[in-house]
């Protein structure tokens, strides 16, 4: 008998999905080799639970939501930035192709979405708390931030520092606000603290820290040498340098070229370091952000886990530039 003779019985509902199919489909995701539990969003989430006291089973589900979404964002970011390396290895889309990597990243996000329903039994008032609106709000914010970042890059429009901070508030802040808001909704504590200001400043701090690190020698082995220039990206220190001397078009000209050679990128980096002092400015801003974050932490009564995280991400004075 041909399969077509009994086609309706062959496919009565949604097709079954085997474990082997799932494993193959997730390969670009698993290739990242990211231990999501050791990534900053997950670490901050666990530290925030010091105040929210969400039961461990519910906390685990929240981590299973934020971890994969963060990893999926990295997969998409690498494609949109046309990156070559992540963690010192070729990026996933250079191994599996752009199409497969996009499909896997999207699937991982939807898989995380499904876990929202598993949190409903932990809600005190499931009829009044909409967990779906929380995840929808923050995923939308993330995409809005990513859009404006790409728009500036592709249109060669240098934003102001204030505009950049607002972009970070959406793009990076969403990854930290999402789990915090879920914990807030799930908390059995009668009076939970307002962690929004702290989490928002953490998102800004983390992004600007990454912007500065991406111009350091230590970052070269993970992502390549000064890849922000090759990507034409307006990072925080680059924005400061462009705005510091509008009469000098050197940096804008280099960003327009999106150079791959180290000599051109080193020329841009030395201009930022020696002429506009943009690396020093970025470090000074980081110090102010750290101070604000620690003050906010004190207002909330302190948190040893978050204090440890702040110590871990603290940067020493501006890293030295090494010749290449």
Swiss-Prot record:
Keyword ATP-binding in record: no
Catalytic activity: (2E)-geranyl diphosphate = (E)-beta-ocimene + diphosphate; (2E)-geranyl diphosphate + H2O = linalool + diphosphate; (2E,6E)-farnesyl diphosphate = (3E,6E)-alpha-farnesene + diphosphate; (2E,6E,10E)-geranylgeranyl diphosphate = (E,E,E)-alpha-springene + diphosphate
Binding site for Mg(2+) 2: 77, 81
Molecular function terms from GO: lyase activity; metal ion binding; prenyltransferase activity
Signal peptide stretch: none
Gene3D superfamilies associated with the record: Farnesyl Diphosphate Synthase (1.10.600.10)
Binding residue positions for Mg(2+) 1: 77, 81
An individual GO BP term: isoprenoid biosynthetic process
Needed cofactors: Mg(2+)
EC number: 4.2.3.-, 4.2.3.106, 4.2.3.46
Note from the entry: IDS-like terpene synthases originate from a geranylgeranyl diphosphate synthase (GGDPS) progenitor in fungi, after the split of Melampsora from other genera within the class of pucciniomycetes. They lack coupling activity and act as classical terpene synthases.
Function of the molecule: Terpene synthase that shows monoterpene synthase activity and produces (E)-beta-ocimene as a major product and linalool as a minor product, using geranyl diphosphate (GPP) as substrate. Also shows sesquiterpene synthase activity as it is able to convert farnesyl diphosphate (FPP) into (E,E)-alpha-farnesene. Finally, TPS1 can convert geranylgeranyl diphosphate into (E,E,E)-alpha-springene.
Protein name, UniProt field: IDS-like terpene synthase 1
Phylogenetic lineage: Eukaryota, Fungi, Dikarya, Basidiomycota, Pucciniomycotina
Gene encoding the protein: ILTPS1
């Amino acid at each position: 008998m041909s399969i077509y003779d009994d086609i309706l019985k062959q496919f009565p509902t949604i097709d079954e999905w085997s474990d082997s199919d799932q494993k193959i489909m997730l390969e670009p995701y698993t290739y990242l080799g990211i231990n999501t539990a050791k990534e900053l969003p997950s670490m901050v989430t666990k530290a925030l639970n010091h105040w929210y006291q969400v039961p461990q089973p519910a906390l685990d589900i929240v981590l299973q939501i934020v971890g994969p979404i963060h990893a999926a964002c990295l997969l998409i970011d690498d494609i949109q930035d046309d990156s070559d390396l992540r963690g010192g290895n070729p990026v996933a889309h250079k191994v599996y192709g752009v199409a497969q990597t996009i499909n896997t990243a999207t699937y991982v996000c939807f898989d995380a979405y499904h876990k929202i329903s598993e949190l409903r039994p932990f809600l005190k008032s499931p009829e009044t708390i909409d967990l779906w609106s929380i995840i929808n709000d923050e995923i939308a914010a993330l995409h809005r931030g990513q859009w404006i970042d790409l728009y500036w890059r592709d249109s060669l429009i240098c934003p102001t520092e204030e505009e950049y901070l607002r972009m970070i508030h959406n793009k990076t802040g969403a990854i930290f606000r999402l789990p915090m808001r879920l914990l807030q909704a799930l908390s059995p504590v009668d009076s939970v603290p307002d962690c929004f200001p702290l989490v928002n400043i953490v998102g800004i701090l983390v992004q600007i820290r990454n912007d500065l690190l991406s111009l350091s020698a230590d970052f070269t082995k993970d992502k390549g040498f000064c890849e922000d220039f090759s990507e034409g990206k307006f990072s925080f220190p680059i924005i400061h340098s462009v705005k510091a001397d509008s009469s000098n078009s050197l940096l804008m000209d280099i960003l327009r070229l999106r150079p791959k050679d180290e000599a051109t990128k080193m020329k841009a980096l030395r201009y930022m370091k020696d002429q506009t002092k943009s690396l020093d400015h970025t470090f000074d801003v980081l110090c102010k952000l750290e101070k604000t974050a620690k003050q906010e932490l004190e207002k909330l009564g302190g948190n040893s886990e978050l204090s440890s995280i702040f110590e871990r991400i603290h940067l020493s004075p501006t890293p030295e530039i090494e010749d290449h």
